[in-house]
């Protein structure tokens, strides 16, 4: 009986660390915000919604998965900034240049990033989950 329990424990621990498994990450880690900023810049390049650019406010959740490279999946609170689309190009957006617009629209987005650093490859897939009311805490 003891041998079976030891083997099951070993199998469970081994399976948790296998390639391809989804791992929850610390959403507050600075590396995630950097990746999210790059994704939101792409979101702004492909969108004409509103007069101002969107900026990330908070990484709500972060997950990773080892595939042919790394796949990162984020839920991100995004909000309207004070940076006008006509005055600031999407690739020039930064937290130093753009701050939150008072009363601006907020939304929750899913940002997926597939990276293969050895090939200098990064591909973003971005989708809006829902709008977020100003009074709603996330």
Predicted regions and their residues:
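N- and C-terminal low-complexity/disordered segments
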Residues: 2-138
